[in-house]
Curated annotation (Swiss-Prot):
Gene designation per UniProt: MED2
Protein name: Mediator of RNA polymerase II transcription subunit 2
UniProt xrefs under InterPro entries: Mediator_Med2_fun (IPR021017)
Region (Disordered): 112-231, 265-308
GO molecular function, one term: RNA polymerase II-specific DNA-binding transcription factor binding
Similarity comment: Belongs to the Mediator complex subunit 2 family.
Alphabetized UniProt keyword annotations: Activator, Nucleus, Transcription, Transcription regulation
């Protein structure tokens, strides 16, 4: 069933009236009735006229309706577009706001990070400054301690020097002389020592020698009026000795038995042994004063001054000029036959290039 509205109903009525009028016109033509002017009546014409007017009215209403509908649709479309545009604007604004918030957050984070870095840098600098100050304080303390220790050492050295000076000031070096008289003539050997006083010490008095050797309270250098600085200069040349040729001294292959010499006058075990020193037969007063005894024999020849002193004469030393005894006239190299020389080595006819057995002395260092 089709849907009918005013327009379709009016259109159906128009078609119906028009069909009746056409059928009346056909009947007129077929019957050929002279009294029938029109094929349809006036009522039918009026009905058809009304229907046509109604149809046109419906079309006008339909046009208005369609126009209004178009306007409404356009309005809805515009409203939709405006709403869409508003939504887009809102979304854009919201997006911009979110971006701005993100940017603010990033700026805040960067600011906080920068502040944190600055704070850390500040703390680091403070820590470095504290460490630097601490190190400076420690360095000052160390220097202060070193200065105090140095001052203490200096005061100790000054005190030691003052003690030594006071000790040496108490000694008498002006009257040290040596009595070279033979025991057969005068019967005594007078030795004036600064440590023993200016009085004579008789050699005839029996004084047993100890096992440790002679009395160490009488330094021989001080007896001749020599100080520490003067006596040290006598042996300074030993520091310049070249010992590179004795390369085996540091090893275990150095044979020291070849250097044993018969120093009977200086190292006679029989004469210098403790029993003989304590033996009355060898240490009695007659033995000590016997001019024929080798122990008490004294050579009165002064090699440095080229003088021969007789028995009973006294060799005096000038204490104001200690170097007079140790002048150029003293032959320090004449050591007698008890010392080996280069000629003694050459007389041995040793093949210096031949290598010995393992552990022996390497003779290549002694090539002459």
């Amino acid at each position: 069933m089709s849907y009918k509205n005013r327009l379709t109903a009016c259109f159906d009525d128009i078609l119906k009236v028009s069909a009746e009028m056409m059928m009346q016109q056909q009947l007129k033509n077929v019957q050929l009735d002279p009294y029938m002017v029109n094929g349809f009546s006036a009522q039918q014409q009026n009905t058809l006229k009304e229907k046509i007017h109604m149809f046109h009215g419906i079309l006008d209403d339909l046009e208005n309706m369609l126009s209004k509908s178009t306007y409404y649709v356009d309005t809805l479309a515009n409203l939709g577009k405006e709403s869409k545009r508003q939504k887009e604007l809102e979304l854009e604004k919201q997006r911009e706001q979110e971006e701005e918030e993100k940017k603010q957050k990033l700026l805040e984070l960067e600011r906080k990070k920068k502040e944190q870095e600055e704070e850390e840098e500040k703390k680091k600098k403070q820590k470095e400054e504290e460490e630097k100050r601490k190190k400076e304080l420690e360095e000052q303390e160390r220097k202060k301690k070193e200065q105090e220790e140095e001052e203490k050492r200096r005061r100790q050295q000054e005190q030691d020097g003052d003690k030594q000076q006071s000790m040496f000031d108490g000694l008498d070096f002006t009257n040290a002389d040596l009595d070279t008289s033979q025991p057969g003539t005068s019967g005594q050997n007078d030795i004036k020592s600064p440590t023993m006083g200016a009085g004579p010490q008789t050699a005839g008095t029996d004084k047993p020698n100890t096992a440790d050797g002679p009395d160490k309270t009488n330094p021989p250098i001080a007896a001749f009026g020599l100080g520490d600085s003067q006596s040290g200069g006598l042996y300074n040349d030993l520091n310049t000795m070249d010992l590179s040729m004795f390369s085996e001294l540091d090893g275990g292959g150095f044979d020291a038995s070849g250097f044993d010499t018969a120093n009977t006058s200086n190292a006679n075990a029989t004469t210098n042994s403790v029993p003989n020193n304590n033996n009355p037969a060898t240490n009695d007063s007659n033995m000590n004063n016997d001019p024929t005894a080798a122990i008490n024999a004294f050579d009165g020849t002064a090699a440095g001054n080229n003088e021969t002193l007789g028995q009973g004469e006294k060799l005096e030393f000038d204490q104001s000029n200690p170097s007079a005894m140790l002048g150029n006239d003293i032959n320090m190299g004449d050591n007698g036959e008890d010392y080996l020389t280069l000629n003694d080595f050459n007389d041995l006819n040793i093949d210096w290039s031949a290598a010995g057995e393992g552990g022996d002395l390497d003779l290549n260092g002694f090539n002459i």
